[in-house]
């Protein structure tokens, strides 16, 4: 772009030609700046955009530097989760979303209770009282924040996370038991682990026969499989009231069984029972938030990480 200058003869002065598409003292058009910013909505790197535009990486970073996202208002439902960002001196960062409208609200520099408290203290009491649902995983600081700052909200433990506790317990028993078998049997058990994890009533007749053969080889695994299957039946409950007694009974049975993995699982379920039962009252989950985390991982992997948290935050919010 040629910077044409005009000369005013009467006062012997020179001045730049005025262009609507070129800000004063700039050599880059507004359209090019807007194009660069729009390209960065995808999980691409500054380097790839700079190469495409034939610009330096620092120029692309400087152009994106004008993008700055402020804080949004709190919705009626909040979803919160952590992800491994390794930026700004912290290993984990925190993402806050609206799981109903599918909107990313903010990214916090850490998942600590101190960081979360500092953030939510910025909102008025009336705004916090309007939050009706608070969805999270089994990270204790999240529950503490919900209790302290969102007294009118219903705390919900995401279904995926508490169901996973039982699957982890069963998988641990399977791995422990298969170590006792011969090499041939170990290989067979390892290849068939998805059959053991899948609900028994969803298997074909042939698959059921395979599972029964494996369970016959290990009484401990057979007991663990029974507890796992009994637990999965609770998922068929339609509401909190119908799930309350079966869940309490299962926790009691698992707590008093002779399998350490399920005893530990029962203790975890007992500690989070209110949030687990509340998950039967609504279809709201952390599914959207987990999906955002996957996209953030792609951005981080492509860029080989971010050292500057503010820049990382703006890139994430810009993508959504």
Positions of the model-derived regions?
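Single conserved hydrophobic/aromatic residue that forms the stacking wall/gate
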Residues: 1-11
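Alpha-helix N-cap/N′ positions at the starts of helices
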Residues: 2, 28-32, 226
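Extended interfacial segments that mediate partner engagement and assembly in macromolecular machines
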Residues: 13-83, 88-89
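Acidic, glycine-enriched active-site microenvironments
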Residues: 25-36, 106, 255-257, 263-264
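Short, surface-exposed amphipathic charged segments that create phosphate/polyanion-binding patches used
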Residues: 94-95, 167-178
């Amino acid at each position: 772009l040629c910077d044409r200058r005009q000369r005013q003869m009467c006062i012997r002065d020179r001045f730049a030609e005025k262009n609507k598409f070129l800000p004063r003292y700039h050599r880059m058009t507004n359209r090019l700046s807007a194009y660069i910013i729009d390209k960065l909505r995808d999980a691409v790197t500054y380097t790839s955009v700079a190469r495409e535009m034939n610009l330096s990486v620092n120029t692309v970073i400087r152009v994106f530097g004008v993008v700055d996202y402020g804080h949004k208002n709190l919705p009626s439902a909040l979803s919160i989760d952590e992800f491994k960002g390794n930026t700004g001196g912290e290993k984990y960062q925190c993402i806050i979303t609206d799981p109903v409208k599918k909107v990313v609200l903010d990214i916090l520099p850490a998942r600590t209770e101190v960081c979360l408290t500092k953030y939510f203290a910025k909102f008025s009491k009336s705004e916090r009282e309007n939050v009706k649902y608070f969805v999270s995983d089994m990270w204790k600081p999240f529950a503490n924040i919900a209790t302290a700052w969102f007294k009118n909200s219903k705390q919900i433990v995401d279904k995926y996370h508490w169901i996973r506790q039982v699957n982890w317990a069963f998988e641990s028993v399977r791995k422990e038991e298969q170590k006792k078998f011969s090499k041939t049997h170990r290989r067979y058990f390892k290849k068939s682990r998805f059959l053991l994890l899948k609900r028994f009533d969803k298997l074909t007749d042939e698959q059921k026969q395979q599972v029964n053969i494996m369970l016959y080889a290990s009484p401990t695994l057979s007991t663990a499989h029974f507890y796992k299957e009994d637990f999965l039946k609770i998922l068929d409950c339609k509401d909190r009231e119908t799930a309350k007694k079966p869940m309490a009974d299962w926790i009691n049975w698992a707590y008093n069984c002779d399998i350490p993995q399920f005893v530990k699982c029962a203790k975890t379920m007992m500690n989070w029972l209110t949030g687990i039962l509340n998950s039967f009252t609504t279809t709201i989950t952390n599914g959207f938030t987990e999906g955002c985390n996957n996209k953030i991982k792609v951005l981080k992997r492509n860029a080989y990480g971010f050292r500057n948290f503010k820049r990382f935050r703006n890139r994430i919010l810009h993508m959504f």
